[in-house]
Structures are given as structure tokens and as C-alpha cells.
Amino acid sequence: MILSASSRTARTGIFNYYVTKGQEDQSWFDKAVADFNKALKVAQKKDDVYYNIAKLMHAYQLSKPEKTYKDWTYDTALKNLRQAIAIDPLPVYTQLEGDILFAQQDYAGALAAYEKVNASNIASPATFFSAAKTKELLKADPKEVIVLMDSCIARCPQPVTSAFAPYLLERAQMNLNANQARNAMLDYDAYFKAVNGQVNDMFYYYREQAALKARQYQRALDDIAKAIELNPKDLTYKAEQAVVNLR
């Protein structure tokens, strides 16, 4: 029979438990492998089993184990995942493919996977952000990266809520990289609003940097003054204030 979503979730939970226990005693990994092999024999939806194997191997490698258990490598995770994709090329499988390739620093391959996901029905702020960061690592034109971040933020709740606000900070930095300082300021302002003004001295310092590049000198002065107020011991802020005053 085809496993229900709840059954698949329960199975993933069990295997995650094995991996957690395996950090202390590798014999638990043997039990996880045995369960996976059993699932492959009885499951009608074998792609789901291959996907879960790949997902666990990926998570295991991200934990940076001191000694890798048997063949639980990124390469093996990718091999299992592509068996799942061969059976049923679901976008969620392709997303994990992108994550594994990203972890292997195969950024071109990861970007190709993320682009497929972004053309699917599971496209989300997170998937567009993954594509943007990958393209950034490929040294693409900063404006191309911003286009992806625009799509990321367009898929966030509007106005952007605090849970999604970090994307605004990311785009602000990308706008600065693209020499679009005024747009960076707008992103910082939107972030400030999204988190109801709950920001620290570093925020004011970064927004001051954007204001300075945008030649908004009074705003730059106001922000660096606020940074100093919140953290008067940081000499960097006082040096920056002196620079702005010279303008």
C-alpha cells in the first residue's frame, strides 16, 4: 500500500532518532540502515524511501561527523536521491538535490536545481533565496542576484513580517554590492518597520554605511550617533562618526 503522509512523517522521525543516537553509538546507524532496507522491500512508493535516506545522509554530513559512518557521504546521498528522482521527479526532491550540491560546493549544479524548483509549485521565499545566494557565490552580476531576491521578498507576506525580515537585510547588502545605496536604505527601513524597531547598534552602523554611500549625510550622522548611544565602547563607531562629520 502507498504510505500516507503521516506514516512517512513517522518513519522519518524514527530514522532521525537513529541518527541522533548514532552520534553516541554507531550501532544505531546499523539499525537505521536495516529499517531503510526493509522499507525498500515493502514500500510501494520507493522514491519516498530513497528521498528519506538521502535527506538523512545530508543532515548527517552537515553535522560534520569526526568519522563518517560507512558510505554515508554526500555522494551516496546524491545517488539515492537521484534514484528517487528517476522514479518520480518531485520538486521537493530537486530542492534537496540543490542543497546537497551546494554542500559539495557544486554551485552551478545547485543553481540549476534551484531554478527548477523556482519554476514549480513549491517555489517559496526560501527557494529563491537559495538561488540568489548560489548565484552570488558564482560571482554573477549583482543585479541578477537582486532580481532573485526581489522574487524572494515578493513571495513573503506583505508587509513583510519579522519572521521574513532577514531577507530584507540580505537584499540590503546585495543592493550595496550593486552600488544601489538608496535601495539598500529602503530595505533597512523596511526591516526596521518589520521588527518594530527592535534593532541593535550593528543595524544602525550598517544603515549608516548605506546612507553615507547614498550621500544622505544627516541620516548617516543620526544612525552612527544611535549606534554609539547603544554601544559607546566600540571605537569603530566613533571613528566612523568622525568620517561622516568631515563630509
Where are these regions (language model features)?
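Canonical tetratricopeptide repeat
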Residues: 9-11, 52, 96, 130, ...
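Register position in tetratricopeptide repeats
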Residues: 16-20, 59-60, 103, 137-138, ...
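Short coil turns that delineate tetratricopeptide repeat
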Residues: 2-5, 44, 87-89, 122-123, ...
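Canonical positions in the second alpha-helix
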Residues: 38-39, 83-84, 116-117, 152, ...
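Start-of-helix register in tetratricopeptide repeats
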Residues: 4-7, 48, 55, 90-93, ...
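Residue-level recognition of tetratricopeptide repeat
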Residues: 11-16, 55, 62, 99, ...
